Regions:
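Catalytic-site microenvironment of enzymes
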Residues: 1-222
């Protein structure tokens, strides 16, 4: 029920948010906006009084940020410029996350979450992209999602639930290629034990970075 409510929030921003987001309609491909070193937006989901999923002492907003910090550190080590939508435990509205991404002139955005379901048997990784009517944006986002999924599965050995289309605000209303990664189910006991291990989060982060690099490589001719 909690996850359903949170998904509805992602799908249907408030009227104030919607008014702000209507400004952002033009897609900017990575090739057009990256003159040199690529800039990447990393979006740790939830924060502040928005906990996301909570199972025992494991809170999604905390794991989202921890994983995002690992991703950011690896990207910076590889020479990328990184912009985080939040760097600490604070609430950031969906509209503000989208605004930041759209003003950043970044190459792409990755939003990081962990999953929940009523069924305790649900497990595995999901990556979402928006099925945009603008074919170029849809193709870029799907390509990014496919590559990230490939590398993440290789490193984590997790089950794949596939690359899917989604109508989440943070991937729908951004002007750059954007994906939302669900790194596993906190409601599955076996998967929760893995997620609680730091090495799993580091492997997940490395897979995300490897996928980003593979996506950007042909654009930079390297």
């Amino acid at each position: 029920m909690v996850r359903l409510f949170l998904h509805l929030v992602f799908l249907f921003p408030t009227s104030g948010d919607a008014a702000r987001l209507r400004k952002h309609t033009n897609f900017k491909s990575a090739q057009k906006i990256v003159p040199g070193r690529a800039k990447i937006v990393i979006d740790p989901g939830h924060g502040g009084d928005d906990f996301g999923t909570k199972v025992g002492h494991t809170i999604e907003k905390v794991i989202n940020l921890k994983t995002a910090e690992y991703v950011a550190a690896l990207l910076r080590k590889s020479g990328f410029e990184v912009l985080m939508t939040r760097k600490k435990d604070v609430f950031i509205s969906l509209a503000d996350r989208v605004d930041l991404a759209n003003r950043s002139k970044a190459s792409l955005m990755v939003s990081i979450h962990f999953n929940a379901a009523q069924s305790k048997e649900a497990e595995g990784l999901e990556i979402f992209y928006f099925k945009d009517p603008i074919l170029e944006r849809k193709n870029h986002s799907k390509n990014l999602a496919d590559l990230v999924m490939r590398f993440v599965l290789n490193l984590t050995k997790a089950k794949s639930r596939g690359v899917k289309t989604g109508n989440f605000c943070v991937i729908r209303d951004t002007q750059i290629p954007s994906i939302l990664v669900e790194g596993g189910f906190l409601t599955n006991e076996r998967e929760l034990e893995k997620i609680r291990q730091d090495q799993y989060l580091r492997s997940l982060a490395q897979g995300i970075v490897d996928g980003i690099e593979a996506y950007l490589k042909p654009m930079h001719g390297s």
